[in-house]
UniProtKB/Swiss-Prot annotation:
Keyword field: Lignin degradation, Methyltransferase, S-adenosyl-L-methionine, Transferase
Native organism: Phanerochaete chrysosporium (strain RP-78 / ATCC MYA-4764 / FGSC 9002) (White-rot fungus)
Domain of life, per lineage: Eukaryota
Name of the featured protein: 3-O-methyltransferase 2
Classification via PANTHER family: O-METHYLTRANSFERASE CICE (PTHR43712:SF2), PUTATIVE (AFU_ORTHOLOGUE AFUA_4G14580)-RELATED (PTHR43712)
Record-stated family: Belongs to the class I-like SAM-binding methyltransferase superfamily. Cation-independent O-methyltransferase family. COMT subfamily.
GO MF annotations in UniProt: O-methyltransferase activity; protein dimerization activity
Length: 447
């Protein structure tokens, strides 16, 4: 490299390559220290260090750097027209994932290490062999499935996540189904004189396509789509850092008997992990009365002692109208505010503030977005090293996918730290600290 002039752009490329190299060495080092090999794409075994809860921060950071730097390197050296057209063709990947998941191809390939021919898969799935072959060839080209020999496909490390027994497949079903359909109306909605300026949940791309709001849709399609949506929420928790909650905050500083109010907590699945780790904590789960049986079933199955000794309870709430249980030590709000526009979020937080005692804390557990300019770099925000985009670009892209999903589905959004601080201030709350979990974060407030 030293034989060539060190132009600014050459230095940019070299810096990206060095980031990739050093981060790959970090990945190798972590696995080596654990006495394990890095999993092959062809492997079907449960991977080591595959979940957020088991991934050391250094490995998580290295993975994000590699994803960010590889993507930035590719778009820097490729022809611009190629890049844009390939991005526009991204719908084909969603379409093929939809076919593979709905046809249960990964299920049929379970326990078939030598693979099955597309003719056999066609008989099992009911999809035409020629067309199925096109779909699987595309997915294998994208490293989903492995072509053992011409037209014979086997599962690999990625395709096993499409098995119907894996909740991630429910995520794929929702994303490539009703959300994919809603995305086709993005321009029609944003350019519509009535829908475009509105932030009402009744004026969304989702409603334009499906004739119902996001939540109405799942209420009226209970038999077909609600179970899949519920499974998708489990899958979402598995691939985000729900399991990291016990590690994300200084829970040990709470006094024995401290009470966490899980506002809008559904069945309390997130705070269940917390009580398992810190049995001196009590949890009050608050959500709609209709969710009480789900809370009872989950806790009775996973931690029955907590019900028997009163370390968990369920108190119904409409968080827009009702004040949560008063004088709790922590009010925990997970993936609730991203469903709602700012005014609605302020109302929820005002009700929470009304319930707080002077020592109480609010913990908002959400994605925290960053801008792509270094003007947004703050002490609180974990920013990527140069020459990467400060928000890690492709290394943290899923939170930006989610942001657009909330826009199209609910007229809402994921928020930056400043946006959280602003809605907190409108509710009378004071920002304390950002606790970064690697993917999501806890935004802490006092009253």
């Amino acid at each position: 490299m030293s034989d060539y002039p060190k132009t600014p752009q050459a230095a940019h490329l070299t810096a990206l390559v060095e980031l990739i190299s050093s981060s790959v060495n970090e990945v190798i080092s972590v696995y080596s220290a654990a006495g394990r090999d890095i999993p092959s794409l062809d492997s079907l075994e449960e991977g080591f260090l595959e979940t957020p809860a088991t991934t050391p921060p250094g490995l998580r950071h290295a993975r994000q750097i590699i994803e960010a730097a590889c993507a930035q390197l590719c778009v820097t050296i490729a022809q611009p027209g190629d890049c844009i057209v390939n991005k526009a063709f991204a719908y084909t990947e969603s379409a093929c994932l939809q076919v593979a998941a709905n046809a249960k191809i990964s299920d049929f390939l379970a326990d078939k290490p030598d693979g099955l021919h597309t003719e056999e898969l066609a008989k099992l799935s009911g999809v035409d062999a020629g067309k199925l072959g096109q779909v699987l060839r595309f997915l294998a080209t994208k490293h989903v499935y492995r072509e053992v020999r011409p037209n014979v496909y086997a599962n690999n490390r990625l395709s096993v996540k499409l098995m119907s027994s894996d909740p991630v497949s429910c995520n794929v079903g929702v994303c490539t189904g009703e959300l994919f359909q809603a995305a086709t109306a993005a321009w029609d909605t944003l350019s519509d004189k009535e829908y475009g300026p509105s932030y009402l949940p009744t004026k969304t791309a989702f409603r334009k396509v499906h004739g119902a709001t996001f939540f109405e849709y799942y209420e009226t399609h209970v038999r077909l789509n609600l179970p899949r949506f519920s499974g998708a929420m489990v899958g979402w928790g598995n691939i985000t850092d729900r399991g990291l909650l016990p590690q994300m905050y200084e829970w040990q500083r709470l006094e024995p008997g401290a009470t966490i109010c899980d506002v809008g907590g559904n069945n309390g699945h997130a705070t269940l992990d917390l009580v398992k780790e810190y049995p001196m904590i009590s949890v009050i789960v608050q959500d709609l009365e209709s969710l009480r049986p789900r809370w009872s079933d989950l806790w009775a199955r996973e931690l029955p002692d907590a019900i028997q000794d009163g370390r968990t309870s369920f108190v119904p709430i409409d968080f827009f109208r009702d004040i949560p249980v008063r004088n709790c030590d922590v009010y925990y709000i997970r993936h609730i505010l991203h469903d709602w526009p700012d005014a609605s979020c302020v109302q929820i937080l005002r009700n929470v503030k009304e319930a707080m005692q002077p020592s109480s804390r609010v913990l908002i557990h959400e994605y925290v977005l960053q801008q792509t300019t270094r003007d947004d770099v703050t002490v609180e925000n974990d920013s990527a090293p140069e020459p990467l985009l400060p928000n890690y670009g492709n290394g943290r892209i899923r939170r930006y996918y989610q942001d657009i999903t909330m826009l199209l589905g609910l007229n809402s959004k994921e928020r930056t730290l400043q946006e959280f601080i602003d809605i907190g201030a409108q509710a009378g709350l004071k920002f304390v600290k950002l606790w970064d979990g690697g993917q999501t974060a806890l935004v802490e407030f006092s009253c």
